[in-house]
């Protein structure tokens, strides 16, 4: 299973400010830092997300078709997380709402470096 995902950034301080505030919404915070890399998680034994200035010295670019999905436990949390991302300067890529008939509820946005993220939950069916 996935341990963590890393996204590139060209401005680590700006990315840290964005993710510090955003990931607080789901109980995650910084747990590992170096000069070029910062990792976030709810706990060191839980999946996480990292941001990094590329080690090859080239500019960070967005992966075409790449997306990071963060799971929460309710549509309300999807809505809150999405609104927080937009308030922090993220770009809308799909407003919160149900997708299909499976109970999948999601929202999509791009962070300040253009990386695409999704926040989702599975609604309980009655």
Regions found by a protein language model. Give the residues of each.
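Long, continuous compositionally biased terminal/linker segments
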Residues: 41-80
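Vicinal oxygen chelate
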Residues: 26, 86-126
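Conserved active-site tyrosine of GNAT-family acetyltransferases
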Residues: 15-19, 85, 114
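Core segments of cupin and vicinal oxygen chelate
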Residues: 7-48
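N-terminal beta-strand motif that seeds the catalytic metal site of vicinal oxygen chelate
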Residues: 1-16, 68, 123-126
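Mid-chain, well-packed structural core segment of small domains
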Residues: 67-99
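Short glycine-enriched loop/turn motifs at secondary-structure junctions
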Residues: 1, 61-64, 101
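Conserved beta-strand segments that form the floor/walls of ligand-binding pockets within enzyme
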Residues: 4-6, 50, 67, 108, ...
């Amino acid at each position: 299973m996935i341990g963590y995902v890393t996204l590139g950034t060209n401005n680590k301080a700006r990315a840290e400010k964005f993710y510090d505030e955003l990931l607080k919404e789901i109980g995650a915070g910084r747990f590992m830092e170096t000069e070029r890399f910062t990792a976030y998680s709810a706990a060191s034994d839980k999946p996480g997300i990292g941001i990094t200035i590329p080690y090859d010295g080239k500019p960070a670019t967005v992966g075409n078709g790449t997306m990071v999905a963060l799971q929460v436990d309710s549509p309300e949390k999807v809505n809150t997380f999405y609104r927080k991302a937009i308030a922090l300067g993220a770009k809308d890529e799909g407003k919160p709402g149900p997708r299909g008939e499976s109970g999948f509820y999601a929202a999509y946005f791009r962070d300040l470096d253009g990386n695409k993220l999704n926040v989702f939950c599975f609604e309980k069916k009655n």
